[in-house]
Amino acid sequence: MSIIDNRKAFFDYHIEERYEAGLVLEGWEVKALRAGRGQIKEGYVVVKHAEIFLIGTHISPLPEASTHIKPDPVRTRKLLLHRDEIKKLIGKVEQRGYTLVPLNFHYKGGRVKCEIGLAKGKKLHDKRETEKKRDWEREKARIMRSAT
């Protein structure tokens, strides 16, 4: 079950591979995500010192958040992957012009996971082509409905 989706990622990038990563979250962040108070549209993934971090995601704290903790909604969050997956991703990101983008947050066994995609940026003409295909599919569906 998906908590938050990043639909903009599919419009801006060609997603070639997907990986599921664990997230290092604080308690108030998990509660806020359960309430649906997160946004990953502007988020991106970076590699630092052979570790992978999620930057730019916004998780708004609940008003009932603890009083002794100052919540930071846009803090950097560490992603948890196997070492060989990290090495593979580092190699592709550094050599072949790929980037890593967060695709969604979802639950797996009661824990919050982040699906990240190994992606290449689309050019403007690719985006237009995608839009034309989507419009044509809608038009075909409309024609088929009216014909029957």
Swiss-Prot record:
GO terms for cellular component: cytosol. One of its GO terms (biological process) is trans-translation. PANTHER family: SSRA-BINDING PROTEIN, TMRNA-BINDING COMPONENT OF TRANS-TRANSLATION TAGGING COMPLEX. This is SsrA-binding protein. Residues 123-148 are annotated as: Disordered. One of its GO terms (molecular function) is RNA binding. Residues 126-142 have a biased composition (Basic and acidic residues). Belongs to the SmpB family. It comes from Burkholderia mallei (strain ATCC 23344). It holds the Pfam family SmpB.
